[in-house]
Amino acid sequence: MSQSIEGLFAQTLARRHVLKLFGVGGIAALLSYSRLSKPQPTVFQRDRLELPTQVGKPTTAVVIGGGLAGLAAAYELSQRGVAVTLLERSPQLGGKIASWPIQVGEESFMMEHGFHGFFPQYYNLFSLVDELSIQQNFKSLDYYSLVYKDHYDPEVFRPSNSAFPWNIVDLAISSSNRLEWGINLTHLKHLQVFREITGFRNPQTYERLDQLSVTEWVGNDFPKGLYDLYFLPFAKSSLNSPDVLSAGELMQFFHFYFFGNPEGLAFNGTCQDMGRSLVDPMVEAIQANGGQVLTGVTVSQVAWQEGKVAGVTYQNGSVVVNPVPFWVDRNPLLSSETMEYFGAGDSVYSVAPGAKTALSLTCTHQGCSVQRQVTTTAEGYLCPCHGAAYASDGAVLAGPARENLATFEVLQREGDRIQLMAANVDGVPNVAHDLTADYYVMAADIPGIKALFSLSDGEVEPALVSQIDQLQVADPFAVGRFWLDRDFDWQHSWFTSLSGYRLTDSITLYHRIQDDYIAWGDRTGGSVVELHAYCYKEKDFPTQADILDTFEAELYEIVPELKGATVLHRQLVNQKNFAGFPPGSFANRPQTATAVNNLLFAGDWVRMPFPCGLMERAVSSGLLAANAILQREGVQRRPILSVNPEGVLKI
């Protein structure tokens, strides 16, 4: 095996370079690692004293946001006797793993925000799965493929019990692209790259690399094959584009998914939609412990008093039906002299020059963004997905939509943004409900957390406001799901990452994964294929029609057998709300605990004390928030698990 390592790291590697870069201790750590001994998860939080597991006095908490982070916090707190009230603005719980019904012809399906892989090193997420006894809701996808449009052979990742360096050895043995990597460890720059990707430490890695974007970091003599094969596709799978992603954050991401991960890159999917498979059992557990879960409610005020959160006020319904103001940024890519547009993705608003009202362009049929259509005889809006047509004032002209587009009052302008409020709500009864609690967990996404702080009444800690203001969302993502009248042969994994296409970053065969879709495929002989764009540039695809048309064109490139197939239905999800991790954002990123002793944050956007990503980051942040409350109440904290928090080659 030592010969394999020698061949991988270069036959002519100078001993003095290695010793200078890694030190004797680092080399000892590398060589002493045993392939036969799988590293066990690191326990991040474990109380040494035996403390009570339940709160000893009545304790209340309000959790704002019903995504994975908020659900995890509410679940753990409700298990410990805390009286929890969970508020969620959407009709569905789950955030980015929410599910909702759609109509496809005469049949109903559950739609999602795109396929999510449940990786085996999601230790905290799977600890909840075990406690809820819902292991049967997940299925292994056996292996994971990464397919390139040009030049390179596919890469295949399988389950593993080996961490670094043996997972690198295994990859070098299995990859037919290994001679394309372009690594030469006698080259100082390449040695430095190797040092960074194998020696992640927090905060030292961020101190070196957080001020650089990934694009900047790889722009100076970086191994091209290594970038094309692994860094580019995996960087985009963080849902952040390399040109606006911190290089330090990417090192954390790589450590969690590969260099510090002894489980391999094969993963599970859900047997049904993620709502039924994971979200619903979590909600049922919260409610079984007395928790109150409210959906379709909008927070209208956050009261502050004496440096603490004093309470929140909410109203029933979304922003469409209640008088809660909100801000939205101008979209320069869509705006013209004849019409201004604000927002992005599936939350876009049009404002005519000088108008005091705005029109929501969210189709009332199934949530797509309608497109402006101007002809010689009429002007209006058309849904690119299902053909619903609206007049210029938002009135329905043709189905399948049955309700008019929503209208909003323009309350004020501030630079390139406007403040809107639902119009025509004066006669609609909507009672404000006040909530007070001992603790508040804000677990909304970044647009949501910014909206909560904009609704503050009272004096807020300035440093906290600064932290929230600097948060940024990533470039938008898009998911196109296509129902077709024929099946096709596919030699790769049922979820496959793709690289080299203008828009598409992955393909998922739903008629091979989820039970309802499998049954439909068996019954009809058709297929259901999902294409996912993780972080596209709006200037390249300014409208949803552009996105759908490009998805469909690339589908026939990816699966030539589908040329000539009939598209029975196509469904689009297009949002701009994923957490951004731009250069320079690490130092001032909010953590779970705040300077306000009754306020906690949770979400995939918070600064974490150990490596984690995506769903595991959301769940872990929620459990950390719950632990902070439990600790303040003198209650046993939940042990939090992680991969090895530092790289083997510590620097």
Question: Could you describe each region identified by the protein language model?
Answer:
Residues 1-14, 38-41:
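N-terminal secretory signal peptides
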Residues 14-23, 27, 31:
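N-terminal export leaders
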Residues 59-85:
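N-terminal Rossmann-like FAD-binding beta1-loop-alpha1 element of flavoenzymes
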Residues 79-101:
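Glycine-rich FAD pyrophosphate-binding loop
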Residues 125-126, 130-131, 136-251, 260:
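Mobile amphipathic helical/loop "lid" adjacent to a hydrophobic cofactor/ligand pocket
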Residues 257-323, 414, 426-433:
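Helical element adjacent to the flavin cofactor pocket in flavoenzyme catalytic cores
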Residues 318-377, 404-427:
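N-terminal pre-ligand scaffold of iron-sulfur
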Residues 437-439, 444-584, 589, 595-597, ...:
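C-terminal segments that line or cap access tunnels to active or ligand-binding sites in enzymes
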